[in-house]
Amino acid sequence: MKTFLIFALLAIAATSTIAQQQPFPQQPIPQQPQPYPQQPQPYPQQPFPPQQPFPQQPVPQQPQPYPQQPFPPQQPFPQQPPFWQQKPFPQQPPFGLQQPILSQQQPCTPQQTPLPQGQLYQTLLQLQIQYVHPSILQQLNPCKVFLQQQCSPVPVPQRIARSQMLQQSSCHVLQQQCCQQLPQIPEQFRHEAIRAIVYSIFLQEQPQQLVEGVSQPQQQLWPQQVGQCSFQQPQPQQVGQQQQVPQSAFLQPHQIAQLEATTSIALRTLPMMCSVNVPLYRILRGVGPSVGV
């Protein structure tokens, strides 16, 4: 019974205690933040002004093309005949028989006469020899003496006279000296050099009248202007004076033939004796065409 009362008192006390207790204050629920403020309205769209079209510029007119001029009719090229039907070039006569070139457009007067054959040959020969330097002629002096003594480039026989032995001994020395000097001369000058020493030997053996008559240097042989008959007989030039050389002072046809024969022998003998190459032609530089031996 007491126990029941104790429990009843405890229940009453607990009930009163609970009644007196204040309830927990309700904490207000925090309001969620307001959404972002609404953005202002976009700018009012202003209407674009009506675009005015660009003024069309007139296209400049292109210039009229040049009037086409008709080409003149072309002349056809003249057809040349085949080479086997063409006329051959006129063959030139030998060096010693060439005639002077005269103009064909105007006839020459009767007073103008062509050069004599001997004078023409002699003048052309001097024009050729003048290209040989004097030192070359001095260098070939043993060859000149060898030709002057009419030496023969053959071995000396065993049984000969004493005078002939001396001559052959001298010729042998000259032959050696000549063959030492001839190869030292440039090949393009060997022909003119041999011809020059033969010509000097020939002049020494001729009469004094011929020697005096051929002392002229360069002479004008060909007309300077085409179409004018200016081929006149050149005058020999002497130092300090000018005089006429007689016709008899120049080479005669038989002398020309003799000189050419002697030159031909020398041009065959010296190269073979010394085993050197000598051109068998000569070039007259600046005077007419090339002339062969």
Curated annotation (Swiss-Prot):
Signal peptide: 1-19
GO MF annotation terms: nutrient reservoir activity
Residue segments, region Disordered: 20-90
Tissue: Developing endosperm.
Entry keywords, A to Z: Seed storage protein, Signal, Storage protein
Biased composition (Pro residues): 25-81
InterPro entries registered for this protein in UniProt: Bifun_inhib/LTP/seed_sf (IPR036312), Bifunc_inhib/LTP/seed_store (IPR016140), Glia_glutenin (IPR001954)
Family: Belongs to the gliadin/glutenin family.
Function, in words: Sulfur-rich seed storage protein.
Protein name per its UniProtKB record: B1-hordein
Species in which this protein is naturally found: Hordeum vulgare (Barley)
Taxon lineage: Eukaryota, Viridiplantae, Streptophyta, Embryophyta, Tracheophyta
